[in-house]
């Protein structure tokens, strides 16, 4: 579990990238749009975001107040820590049950309890005389109250974090590819991993409106955007790490999708964003990149 406090004096404009670990974040002093898994969110000053693992995220926000920076607090979670907190929340969630629908809402206006707990994290971390395990316990306690407050605002956190819910096949495949994008994935390999047949899997994907080849490309491209934005790998290295058969094919597919070459995108992205904010985000994404790649 890791807490970060990020200030950006400039806009934050990022093409679609992957969040490998579950995350809760609050945004202050921003306006614009954030997109999580295809759901477009209009940002108006104070917002709490609930982001499940392997989510696709993009954003284009600017300062709401001309003289004040955009302020972002993030709490990145591990699956083990999240399950530990959910085990404590489960009895309370069952007894309260304010949820009337099971569609994922990835955002809400920041409740006072959430704001208070993130303020405590900012003020107290790192603990002056604390051990890493004590810091983790402190963050878990804050997470408990944050999730409970979000739930009582009517957000189905069980659904968002995919506890006890079946996921569409395209999402299951997305998770597989994201964990090993460099692998030369074939429909037969994926079907075997998901304990089904290629024909059945192809039929499921057809019902969900996507082909396997297109899904493969749609998953690998945001991973490439991650590398172009947050790393210094060459375009050739990125094409290899993302599983493209050749650098030429990667560059051609990238230009067809985004209307510019990978090198042009990297230059544009770095010119458009606050370098300090990008550097902080890059350090936060570094561990996730190492785990996945």
UniProtKB/Swiss-Prot annotation:
One of its GO terms (molecular function) is DNA-binding transcription factor activity. Residues 188-209, 235-258 bind DNA. Residues 171-268 form the HTH araC/xylS-type domain. Keywords: Activator, DNA-binding, Transcription, Transcription regulation, Virulence. The keyword Transferase does not apply. Disulfide bonds: none annotated. GO terms for cellular component: cytosol. Positive regulator of the expression of the urease operon. This is Urease operon transcriptional activator. It comes from Proteus mirabilis (strain HI4320).
């Amino acid at each position: 579990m890791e807490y970060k406090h990020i200030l950006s004096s400039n806009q934050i404009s990022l093409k679609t990238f992957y969040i490998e670990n579950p995350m809760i974040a609050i945004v202050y002093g921003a306006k614009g749009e954030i997109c999580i898994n295809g759901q477009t969110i209009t940002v108006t000053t104070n917002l709490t975001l609930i982001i499940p693992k392997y989510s696709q995220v993009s954003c284009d926000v600017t300062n709401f107040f001309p003289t004040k920076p955009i302020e972002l607090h993030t709490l990145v979670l591990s699956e083990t820590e999240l399950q530990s907190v959910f085990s404590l929340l489960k009895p309370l969630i069952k007894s309260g049950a304010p949820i009337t629908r099971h569609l994922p809402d990835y955002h809400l206006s920041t409740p006072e309890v959430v704001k208070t707990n993130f303020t405590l994290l900012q003020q107290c971390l790192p603990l002056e005389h604390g051990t890493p395990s004590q810091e983790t316990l402190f963050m878990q306690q804050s997470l408990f109250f944050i999730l409970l407050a979000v739930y009582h605002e009517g957000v189905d956190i069980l659904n968002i974090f995919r506890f006890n819910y079946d996921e569409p096949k395209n999402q299951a495949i997305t998770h597989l590819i994201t964990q090993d994008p460099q692998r030369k994935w074939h429909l037969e390999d994926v079907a075997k991993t998901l304990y089904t047949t290629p024909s059945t899997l192809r039929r499921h994907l057809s019902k969900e409106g996507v082909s396997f080849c297109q899904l493969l490309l749609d998953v690998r491209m945001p991973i490439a955007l991650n590398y172009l934005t947050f790393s210094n790998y060459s375009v050739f290295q990125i094409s290899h790490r993302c599983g493209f058969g050749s650098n030429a094919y990667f560059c051609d597919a990238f230009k067809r999708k985004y209307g510019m070459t990978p090198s042009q995108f990297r230059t544009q992205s770095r010119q458009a964003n606050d370098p300090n904010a990008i550097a902080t985000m890059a350090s936060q994404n570094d561990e996730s990149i190492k785990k996945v790649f």
